[in-house]
Amino acid sequence: MTIKHTQDLAQIRAMVPEMRRVKAIHFIGIGGAGMSGIAEVLLNEGYQISGSDLAANAVTDRLADKGATIFIGHEAHNVAHASVVVVSTAINEQNPEIQAAREKRIPIVRRAEMLAELMRFRHGIAVAGTHGKTTTTALVTQIYSEAGLDPTFVNGGLVKSAGTNARLGSSRILIAEADESDASFLHLQPMVTIVTNIEADHMDTYGGDFENLKQTFIDFLHNLPFYGQAILCIDDPVIRELIPRVSRQVITYGFSEDADVRIENYRQNGQQGQFTVVRKGKANLDITLNIPGRHNALNAAAAIAVATEDDIRDEAILRAMANTQGTGRRFDHLGEFETGNGVAMLVDDYGHHPTEVDVTIKAARNGWAEKRLVMIFQPHRYTRTRDLYDDFANVLEQVDVLLMLDVYAAGEKPIAGADGRSLCRTIRSRGKIDPIFVPDSQTLPSVLANILQDGDLVLTQGAGDVGKVARHLAALELNIGRMQQI
């Protein structure tokens, strides 16, 4: 599907009707990646933006620098001047700002509803799936940017090449990560949808029924217009099963022989992946991808499939793949450091589902086979740890050394037997490795100092505050002497 592009920002703003009676938009939980991205785009469109969160971070600081009003803490008076309030699913009904908005009859909308409003009059490209959404969104954005098409994008993580997770572009293209965690992606009505994979996650949203989750993805694909396109990973067994139920044009990608956009001859050399993309009726592309792992080759193939259908030049695709810097906390190479006992490499990764952890381990093994793999893992949510307990144990026992933090609760109450200590006990009983439970992340540097060896690859893994642990270790430069003093 070829679309007409324009570079005139004033023309685009004229094309996209404003929310006429809305002047001031308030975001509760503005520090989150998904919320901050929408806030930044709306701020650049000229709306008055305010928002609140429990703590300041780099995202809230950046928004404040751009002119947003940021409140630390949730108070009723924060919404006093708002025309509309945007909330994330992490915010409960007892929040004083929600209660104040209801009393004042200020409209309250979910994050996805506001994203849908941004997408309504644009050429929307939505990226959905259990894993790989953020990286795929970044790769699509990189291709369209390399082609000179200046897209608007809203991503769930930092696009390193842009230095932000969202930006208002001058064309009518909007590339957005679509979140299935609360089924709110059903508000979106894109022109093109990528689905990377479908696995059992966020099952509380779907009543514990995987069939319900699958049907929700089908419903989401049917939000496409009849002339829209579904770009689907045929390697995923659930997607392959669902394709006959999709009544829109389907373009498949993957390593599978019957994929419309097929990956061949994948090989990894350290941080880079190299492979050939075979496209029906088009020249093959010999890709050098500047991020590692077969899973990222799949993410790249999805982006290439979209770009190919939109007649983007092959040269732009090749440049985007070679130049991509990846996304924040996705196999994020933080450096190689002289430890005082040799040299060690530090990588940080956001993956928090067993499948994500597994592909990250494989990428580390394939690129640095000679290194001892030391993982610092933080489980995310008690419910996920409970529901995928055996899968976590199976994946985590693949590393050479495992330091286990306790569960990052994300607002959940503890569940007996679904915690870091229990997971350690289960893995230890299997006899492959002897994990070390570290109940206090503040003591982790000193624990790591006692086991670090020359040539180690230290991989911090998880969606909670383990990313802060990674940055702390990087600031200490993995120096054994400095870590022992913590």
Swiss-Prot record:
Compartmental location: Cytoplasm
Signal peptide feature range: none
GO cellular component, one term: cytoplasm
Keyword Ligase attributed: yes
GO annotation, biological process: cell division; cell wall organization; peptidoglycan biosynthetic process; regulation of cell shape
GO molecular function, one term: ATP binding
Catalysed reaction equations from the record: UDP-N-acetyl-alpha-D-muramate + L-alanine + ATP = UDP-N-acetyl-alpha-D-muramoyl-L-alanine + ADP + phosphate + H(+)
Chain positions recorded as ATP binding sites: 129-135
Family the entry assigns: Belongs to the MurCDEF family.
Job of this protein: Cell wall formation.
Identification of the protein by name: UDP-N-acetylmuramate--L-alanine ligase
Lineage of the organism: Bacteria, Pseudomonadati, Pseudomonadota, Gammaproteobacteria, Vibrionales
